[in-house]
Structures are given as structure tokens and as C-alpha cells.
Amino acid sequence: MFTIKTDDLTHPAVQALVAYHISGMLQQSPPESSHALDVQKLRNPTVTFWSVWEGEQLAGIGALKLLDDKHGELKSMRTAPNYLRRGVASLILRHILQVAQDRCLHRLSLETGTQAGFTACHQLYLKHGFADCEPFADYRLDPHSRFLSLTLCENNELP
């Protein structure tokens, strides 16, 4: 049974998974195209960070960064290697979507890579209703970046 916790990023396992996430991004994308946030940036007041646990074992992480009062960005979505293909990413994504709805956000966006190693990520987001979009916030067109967005219904229910 998995438990999702709002996290302060002090647990060593959480810090290690954030570092693993950043390292993985840099292995697949050039540094100028990698937009992963480190622990310090994930502690910004505009970011809410969650961890997923199975007992004492960290299974995954994810974050929601508020861009403005109606637009949020998914950040730092990562499943721990021992938990791949067990539904952790879908679980944290559904949790973040619910939080976005609860906060009355109208749009949720994300930036991810274009390389083959990101295929599972693309499939996850498309399965949950995200669609390709133009760069948002401070992002620019980049052959190493893919931008996706989900418009939440006007009555703020998930589609």
C-alpha cells in the first residue's frame, strides 16, 4: 500500500532520488535543455513537493509549481528504480491533478525531454489527458524539450 506525503525534502532517500532525477535528466539532455529543480529550488514557496512511500521505502516523487493563480507546472516526477511499472507515477500524477483542481487551477503544464528515454513519460501524460502545447512560462522552443498541457474544465472538474 502506497502513502503520499507532503514532503520537506529533508529525508536522505528523498534527496537521493532528487539527485538521481537530475542526473538522469542530464544524461539524456544537454545542460541548457535540462530544467530539473534541485532540492533548494524545490523548497521555494511556490512549489509543493510530495513523496510516495511503501512502508519505509521511497517509491517516487512529484511536485507542483504555481506559475500564477490559475496555472501550475508539474515538476520532478520520478519513480524510484525498484518501483517502476507499479503505478507510482500514475498515483502521484492523479494526486497532483486533484490538488490542482482543489486549488482552482485552470491549466497544468509540463516540460519533458524528446529523447527515446522519455517515451514512458509521454505515454503517461497523454493517457491522463495532456496534449502538446507551445512553450509556457520562461521556456523557449528547444529540440530537446516537449511541452504538454492539460486544461482543467471551466467548472474546475478534471476532464
Curated annotation (Swiss-Prot):
<feature type="domain" description="N-acetyltransferase">
    <location>
        <begin position="4"/>
        <end position="153"/>
    </location>
</feature>
<dbReference type="InterPro" id="IPR000182">
    <property type="entry name" value="GNAT_dom"/>
</dbReference>
<protein>
    <recommendedName>
        <fullName>Uncharacterized N-acetyltransferase YedL</fullName>
        <ecNumber>2.3.1.-</ecNumber>
    </recommendedName>
</protein>
<dbReference type="InterPro" id="IPR016181">
    <property type="entry name" value="Acyl_CoA_acyltransferase"/>
</dbReference>
<dbReference type="Pfam" id="PF00583">
    <property type="entry name" value="Acetyltransf_1"/>
</dbReference>
<keyword id="KW-0808">Transferase</keyword>
<dbReference type="GO" id="GO:0016747">
    <property type="term" value="F:acyltransferase activity, transferring groups other than amino-acyl groups"/>
</dbReference>
<comment type="similarity">
    <text>Belongs to the acetyltransferase family.</text>
</comment>
<keyword id="KW-0012">Acyltransferase</keyword>
<dbReference type="InterPro" id="IPR050832">
    <property type="entry name" value="Bact_Acetyltransf"/>
</dbReference>
